[in-house]
């Protein structure tokens, strides 16, 4: 009923969870785990603050979706977690680069007390086809 999706093109899980789960018997749906802006090759955050971390987080999601045969155009819902809600506009600017006009997924965004590894932003996505 479901398949674990894993790719070395996104960071390995930092806890007991999968990068993503694809549900294919009901329909073709993928649920990614929250992606910090970690560079897969190093496990470190890129230089450049919240913008660089947001970009890397979305690149990680893109890589996971690709492993499942999907693209960012398949994303129907995202959740954005921010260490500081004052970074909302900065993250929005990067986020908009990843989605075609008119194909913006539903989204929720929240400030949280802290993110793993001291991250500034974490994004999760649901994709469907």
What is the predicted role of each segment?
Residues 2-129:
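Short, polar/acidic, helix-capping and beta-turn segments at strand->helix junctions
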